[in-house]
Curated annotation (Swiss-Prot):
GO biological process assignments: cellular response to aluminum ion; positive regulation of DNA-templated transcription; regulation of DNA-templated transcription; response to cold
Residue stretches in coiled coil: 957-985
Polar residues bias locations: 141-171, 183-196
Annotated organism of origin: Arabidopsis thaliana (Mouse-ear cress)
Sites bearing Phosphoserine, chain numbering: S984
Residue ranges annotated for the IQ domain, each copy included: 870-899, 893-922
One matching Pfam family: IQ
GO MF assignments: calmodulin binding; DNA-binding transcription factor activity; transcription cis-regulatory region binding
Stated role: Transcription activator that binds to the DNA consensus sequence 5'-[ACG]CGCG[GTC]-3'. Regulates transcriptional activity in response to calcium signals. Binds calmodulin in a calcium-dependent manner. Involved in freezing tolerance in association with CAMTA1 and CAMTA3. Contributes together with CAMTA1 and CAMTA3 to the positive regulation of the cold-induced expression of DREB1A/CBF3, DREB1B/CBF1 and DREB1C/CBF2. Involved together with CAMTA3 and CAMTA4 in the positive regulation of a general stress response. Involved in tolerance to aluminum.
Record's keyword annotation contains Protein biosynthesis: no
Record's keyword annotation contains DNA-binding: yes
CDD domains on file: IQCD
Protein name (database record): Calmodulin-binding transcription activator 2
Region described as Disordered: 141-196, 223-246
Length: 1050
C-alpha cells in the first residue's frame, strides 16, 4: 500500500469525529501529536478536574499547573501506598519517538484508566494531553472457541439467540483500530450492555500485508472456524477489529437479508453525540465540523510518517443511511439487519461459497485500484463482534485503500515489501502471545516458505543491537543487548540463534542479556532481525537490519605507513592484539552481571555517538591518503569496540592484557594516534595511567611519537603528565613524557606537558588537610591548569606568530608561578616537620604524623598571635640602644660577659683533667699490662700492628623523613627541569605553533565535553522532574495488567 508520507498527502483529521471516537478508544500517537502541536486552537485547563468521567480529554500547561494529576480519582498506588503507580513508555510515529506516555489504572475500578501524553520536543513538552477512558471487560481467551462453535452448530440447523445478545456491526475490509499502544485492551475488550440487543455476524476479510498490526500482542483476529462467545448468550468480539464501513452487498446477499427487515426488534437506541469533557476548540480557531488540514495545522514528521489517514472523498453507501454529523449508521437499520442474521447463518455461509461469481458486484463501489486491496471472503472469516456503544460507527472514509491507521513496525514493513503480492497471509494470536504462521503463496516451493515466525511465548527482550547495517559481503559481528525472561538454568539449556531475514545463524552468550552473532552475506535490502531458539520462531521483538550495497575494501597498513616503518609494526601488533579472544564459560555468564552490563552499555553508547558514515559518503575534499586512513579507522573502530565488549565479559585481566612486546591496546592506540579509541578503552575499565612492561603510560607513547591530538585528549581526560617511566641504567631517575617528547624534537609537546605537570602537581598538593591556607587559595587563582587555559583569540590584524608568542609567554608565566609556589609549599612542609620534632620526636603519645604536622602548624600559628607583647618589648629595647653611645656600651658589656663565660667553662674542664689522667693510667696498668700481659701504651706503634677486622655494626635506624627529604630533592630537580622545558619551548617558533595547536585541541575537547554533559544533565533533570510523581514501567504490574501498552511503536 502506498505510503502517504512519501507522497506528501496532508492528513485530514475531523476533530469532531476524533473527539467522538475518544469516548470508546484511545487516540493514536499521530492524532495526539496533531492536537499537541495545535494546542493554541483548544482550551487549556487552568485547574485540575474533579473526578472526570470516561472519555474526558484535557490539555494542561505543566509550567502553569504542576499538579494536574490531582483529579479526585483513586488510582492504583505503589507499595508505599502514597505515590501513584504509573507506567511509562515512549510512543513512536513511524520509526521516531515523539511522545511520552504515562498511564495509571483505577484502584476501585481497574478498567478505568488515565493516560498523560506530552511531546519529546523541547518547545512543546510543557503541554500535556490527558485522556480518561473506561475499558469494558477483561482479556479474551480464544481457547475453546472451536469447541463452542462445534457445539453450537451440531445440535440444530440454526443458531438461536435470545433478546439479550449484543448488537454488533459488520467490519470493513481493513482493520481500523490499530491505535496507540492499547491494542491489547482494545482487541480483547468484552463489551457488555444491559439493554436487550441482537447479534449480527461480523465479516472479517483477509488483510493486506501492510495493514497487519504486528505489535497487537493479544489481538483476536478471529477464530476463523466459528463463533466467539462468552458469558452465556452475550457474544463478544475483538474491539480492535472494529471498522468504519462496509461495502454495498451484491444482489443475492441483499435478497437473503430482505426477510429480516420485517422481524420484530427492540426499541432503537438514540444516537447521541458523546461529550468530550475538557477538550473544547477555541472560538475563532476552527469552524464547527471543519477538518484540520495542512492549511492551518502542521504535519508532524512529514518525511518519516508511515501511517494512513482517510482521504477527503467518501464512497456512497446505497443501503446504509449515515448520520451527517456523527458519521454513525442508523440504529434502526442496524437492528433490522442484525435481528435475524444469526438464525440464518447457513444461508449466509452458502452465499459466501459463491463469492467468485459475485465478486464483480461486491467490488462495484470501488475503483480499479481500490478493488485490488479487497481480499476474498471465506466462511472462516466470520466472527462475532459486540459494540460498547451498541452501534458501531461506519465511517465512509475507511472504504479507501489508505483508510486504516496501520502500525508500521519493522516486521510489517518487511512483510509489505516482501509479501505485497501475496493474498493469503494468515495471522492469528492466542492468549500466550503472537503466532505468525507460514506464508502460503503461489511462488513458495512445496507449499511452504522460510518467512519469519513469531513464537507463542517471548523469552528475550531486545533493548538494542549494534551494528544496524553492514555491506552485503561483510560478515560483521552483531552485538545484541537485552534481557532474558527465563531463569539462568533455562537460559543455558537453550541454543540461541539470530535470524537475518530467512537465514538463521548461531549466537553466543557473552553475559546475561548480551548475545553476539555474525551477520551472514546477504543481498541488498532490509530484513527482519530477531532472536530465536534455533527453531526459526522469534522469541523476541522484531527489528530491522540493513544490507547496503558495496563490498568491503581491505587495506593493509603498508598502503598508508609504508613497508618498513615503526607505524606499520605498531599497526600489525594492534591488529594481532585485537584478534586475541577467549570463550566465555557458562558459569561466568551470570557473574558480575551489573558491572559488565554497565561497561557494555557505555561502550555501545560511545559507538552510537561516533557512528561512522555510510559507505560512499566520504568527503570529496579528502586526499587519497586521508581517505585510506578513514577507511582503516572505520574497520579498526568496529573491531576495537567488539574486542572491548568481549574482553569486558571475560574473566582475568580483561582489556588490560599486554601483547608479546609488553604493550596494551591503550599504548598501541596512543602510539598510532588513534585518539578516537581512548574513550571506549577507558569505558571498558582500563586506567588512563595504565603502564606497559617498561613503565610507559599511554601519554609516554603519544609524546614519544609526537601525536598532538592524542596528547591533548589524554591530558584532558586526566592523564598524569608527571608520571615517571621505570628507571634504567641510562636514566636512573626515570623519564617523564615531556622528556621523551623533548628527546624526539617535539618541543611544543614537551613544553605543554611540562606546564601541565607543574600546574597539576600544585593543584594536588595541600599543606594542611583541615584548613585551606591562603597560599593554596591564591595559587589556585594565580596558576591556571591546562583545563582552564584557553588559546589567545584571534582578532583583526593578528598573525599566527604573534598569537603563538602570546600563548607561549603566558605558559612561561604560568609555569614559573606554579614552580615558585611549589617551592614555598616544600619549605612550609619542612618547617612543619621541624616543629613536629620539637613537639616530641619519640612520639610518646602515639599520634600520627599528619596529626602532628597539623598540631605543629597550629602551634606555630598560635605562637605568632601570642608573642605580640614580647615583640613590642624587643622593639623598645632596640629603640633604646639605637644610639651609638648606648650601642657601644652594650657591645662592651656583651664582650665581657662572653669572656667570663669562656673562663668558667675552661676552668670546669680543667678540673676534670686529673681525674681523667688517673683513670686512664689505672686502666693501662691493670688491664693492658697485668691482665693481658702486654706492653701497655708504652712503645705503641700503629703501623707494625695489623689492623683488626672491624665488627659489622648494625645499620643505624633510618628515619622516614630522610627518605622523604631525598625524594623531595629529586622532585625539585624535576620541577626545575620542567620549568626549563617550558622556557625552551618559548624560544622556537615551531614549538610555539605546536603548543598553540595543543591548546586549541584541548579547548575544543573541553567544549564538546561540556555540551555533552549539559545535555546529559538536562535529560537527567527532566527525568527527575518526571519521576517526582511518575514511576518507570513496573514489570509485575504489566504482567498482571490486561491493558498494558505494546513496547513496539516503530
Amino acid at each position: 500500500m502506498a505510503d502517504r508520507g512519501s507522497f506528501g498527502f496532508a492528513p485530514r483529521l475531523d476533530i469532531k469525529q476524533l473527539l467522538s471516537e475518544a469516548q470508546h478508544r484511545w487516540l493514536r500517537p499521530a492524532e495526539i501529536c496533531e492536537i499537541l502541536r495545535n494546542h493554541q486552537k483548544f482550551h487549556i485547563a487552568s485547574e485540575p478536574p474533579n473526578r472526570p468521567p470516561s472519555g474526558s480529554l484535557f490539555l494542561f500547561d505543566r509550567k502553569v499547573l504542576r499538579y494536574f494529576r490531582k483529579d479526585g480519582h483513586n488510582w492504583r498506588k505503589k507499595k508505599d501506598g502514597k505515590t501513584v503507580k504509573e507506567a511509562h513508555e515512549k510512543l513512536k510515529v513511524g520509526s521516531i519517538d515523539v511522545l511520552h506516555c504515562y498511564y495509571a489504572h483505577g484502584e476501585d475500578n481497574e478498567n478505568f484508566q488515565r493516560r498523560c501524553y506530552w511531546m519529546l520536543e523541547q518547545d512543546l513538552m510543557h503541554i500535556v494531553f490527558v485522556h480518561y477512558l473506561e475499558v469494558k471487560g477483561n482479556r479474551m481467551s480464544t481457547s475453546g472457541t472451536k469447541e463452542n462453535h462445534s457445539n453450537s452448530l451440531s445440535g440444530t440447523g440454526s443458531v438461536n439467540v435470545d433478546s439479550t445478545a449484543t448488537r454488533s456491526s459488520i467490519l470493513s475490509p481493513l482493520c481500523e483500530d490499530a491505535d496507540s499502544g492499547d491494542s491489547r485492551q482494545a482487541s480483547s475488550s468484552l463489551q457488555q450492555n444491559p439493554e436487550p440487543q441482537t447479534v449480527v455476524p461480523q465479516i472479517m476479510h483477509h488483510q493486506n500485508a501492510s495493514t497487519i498490526n504486528s505489535y497487537n500482542t493479544t489481538s483476536v483476529l478471529g477464530n476463523r472456524d466459528g463463533w466467539t462467545s462468552a458469558h452465556g448468550n452475550r457474544v463478544k468480539g475483538s474491539n480492535s477489529q472494529r471498522s468504519g464501513d462496509v461495502p454495498a452487498w451484491d444482489a443475492s446477499f441483499e435478497n437473503s437479508l430482505a426477510r429480516y427487515q420485517n422481524l420484530p426488534y427492540n426499541a432503537p437506541l438514540t444516537q447521541t453525540q458523546p461529550s468530550t469533557f475538557g477538550l473544547i476548540p477555541m472560538e475563532g480557531k476552527t469552524e464547527k465540523g471543519s477538518l484540520l488540514t495542512s492549511e492551518h495545522l502542521r504535519n508532524p514528521l512529514q518525511s518519516q510518517v508511515n501511517w494512513q489517514t482517510p482521504v477527503q472523498e467518501s464512497v456512497p453507501l446505497q443501503k446504509w443511511p449515515m448520520d451527517s454529523h456523527s458519521g454513525m449508521t442508523d440504529a434502526t437499520d442496524l437492528a433490522l439487519f442484525g435481528q435475524g442474521a444469526h438464525e440464518n447463518f447457513g444461508t449466509f455461509s452458502s452465499l459466501l461459497g459463491s463469492q467468485d461469481q459475485q465478486s464483480s458486484s461486491f467490488q462495484a463501489p470501488f475503483t480499479n485500484n481500490e478493488a485490488a486491496y479487497i481480499p476474498k471472503l471465506g466462511p472462516e472469516d466470520l466472527i462475532y463482534e459486540a459494540s460498547a456503544n451498541q452501534t458501531l460507527p461506519l465511517r465512509k472514509a475507511l472504504l479507501k485503500k489508505e483508510d486504516s491507521l496501520k502500525k508500521v513496525d519493522s516486521f510489517s514493513r518487511w512483510v509489505s515489501k516482501e509479501l505485497g503480492e501475496m493474498e493469503d497471509l494468515q495471522m492469528q494470536s492466542s492468549s500466550g502471545g503472537i503466532a505468525w504462521t507460514s506464508v502460503e503463496c503461489e511462488n513458495a516451493a512445496a507449499g511452504s516458505s522460510l518467512s519469519p515466525s513469531l513464537s507463542e511465548d517471548q523469552r528475550f527482550t531486545m533493548i538494542d543491537f549494534w551494528p544496524k547495517w553492514t555491506q552485503t559481503d561483510s560478515e560483521v559481528e552483531v552485538m545484541v543487548i537485552g534481557t532474558f525472561l527465563l531463569s539462568p538454568q533455562e537460559v543455558t539449556s537453550y541454543s540461541w540463534s539470530c535470524m537475518f531475514g530467512e537465514v538463521e545463524v548461531p549466537a553466543d552468550i557473552l553475559v546475561d542479556g548480551v548475545l553476539c552473532c555474525h551477520a551472514p552475506p546477504h543481498e541488498v535490502g532490509r530484513v527482519p532481525f530477531y532472536i530465536t531458539c534455533s527453531d526459526r520462531f522469534s522469541c523476541s521483538e522484531v527489528r530491522e537490519f540493513d544490507f547496503l550495497p558495496g563490498s568491503t575494501r581491505k587495506l593493509n597498513a603498508t598502503d598508508i605507513y609504508g613497508a618498513n616503518t615503526i607505524e606499520t609494526s605498531l599497526h600489525l601488533r594492534f591488529e594481532n592484539l585485537l584478534a586475541l579472544r577467549c570463550s566465555v564459560q557458562e558459569h561466568h555468564i551470570f557473574e558480575n552481571v551489573g558491572e559488565k552490563r554497565r561497561k557494555i552499555s557505555k561502550i555501545m553508547l560511545l559507538k552510537d555517538e561516533k557512528e561512522p558514515p555510510l559507505p560512499g559518503t566520504i568527503e570529496k575534499d579528502l586526499t587519497e591518503l586521508e581517505a585510506k586512513e578513514r577507511l582503516i579507522r572505520e574497520e579498526f573502530e568496529d573491531k576495537l569496540y567488539l574486542w572491548l565488549i568481549h574482553k569486558v565479559t571475560e574473566e582475568g585481566k580483561g582489556p588490560n592484557i599486554l601483547d608479546e612486546d609488553g604493550q596494551g591496546v591503550l599504548h598501541l592506540a596512543a602510539a598510532l594516534g588513534y585518539d578516537w579509541a581512548i574513550k571506549p578503552i577507558l569505558a571498558a575499565g582500563v586506567s588512563i595511567n595504565f603502564r606497559d612492561a617498561n613503565g610507559w603510560s599511554a601519554l609516554h607513547w603519544a609524546a614519544f611519537s609526537g601525536r598532538e591530538d592524542t596528547v591533548a585528549v589524554l591530558v584532558s581526560l586526566g592523564a598524569d603528565a608527571g608520571a615517571l617511566a621505570d628507571p634504567s641504567p641510562e636514566h636512573p631517575l626515570g623519564k617523564t613524557a615531556a622528556d621523551l617528547a623533548y628527546g624526539n624534537g617535539h618541543r611544543g609537546i614537551s613544553g605543554f606537558l611540562a606546564e601541565s605537570s607543574l600546574t597539576s602537581y600544585l593543584e594536588k598538593l595541600t599543606v594542611d588537610a583541615k584548613e585551606n591556607s591562603s597560599a593554596d587559595s591564591s595559587g589556585a587563582k594565580a596558576v591556571l591548569t591546562v583545563a582552564e587555559r584557553t588559546a589567545t583569540p584571534m582578532s583583526y590584524g593578528d598573525v599566527p606568530e604573534t598569537l603563538s608568542m602570546k600563548d607561549s609567554l603566558t605558559a612561561v608565566l604560568n609555569a614559573t608561578q606554579a614552580a615558585d609556589r611549589l617551592h614555598q609549599v616544600f619549605r612550609m612542609q619542612s618547617f612543619q616537620r621541624k616543629q613536629l620534632s620539637e613537639l616530641g620526636g619519640d612520639n610518646k603519645f602515639d599520634i600520627s604524623d599528619e596529626l602532628a604536622v597539623s598540631f605543629a602548624a597550629a602551634k606555630t600559628k598560635k605562637s605568632g598571635h601570642s608573642s605580640g607583647a614580647v615583640h613590642a618589648a624587643a622593639v623598645q629595647i632596640q629603640k633604646k640602644y639605637r644610639g651609638w653611645k648606648k650601642r657601644k656600651e652594650f657591645l662592651l658589656i656583651r664582650q665581657r660577659i662572653v669572656k667570663i663565660q669562656a673562663h668558667v667553662r675552661g676552668h670546669q674542664v680543667r678540673k676534670q683533667y686529673r681525674a681523667i689522667i688517673w683513670s686512664v693510667g689505672l686502666l693501662e696498668k691493670i688491664i693492658l699490662r697485668w691482665r693481658r700481659k702486654g706492653s701497655g701504651l708504652r712503645g705503641f706503634k700503629r703501623d707494625t700492628i695489623s689492623k683488626p677486622t672491624e665488627p659489622v655494626c648494625p645499620a643505624p635506624q633510618e628515619d622516614d623523613y630522610d627518605f622523604l627529604k631525598e625524594g623531595r630533592k629529586q622532585t625539585e630537580e624535576r620541577l626545575q627541569k620542567a620549568l626549563t622545558r617550558v622556557k625552551s619551548m618559548a624560544q622556537y617558533p615551531e614549538a610555539r605553533a605546536q603548543y598553540r595547536r595543543l591548546l586549541t585541541v584541548v579547548e575544543g575537547f573541553r567544549e564538546n565535553e561540556a555540551s555533552s554533559s549539559s545535555a546529559l544533565k538536562n535529560n537527567t533533570e527532566e527525568a527527575a522532574n518526571y519521576n517526582e510523581e511518575d514511576d518507570l514501567i513496573d514489570i509485575d504490574s504489566l504482567l498482571d495488567d490486561d491493558t498494558f501498552m505494546s513496547l513496539a511503536f516503530e
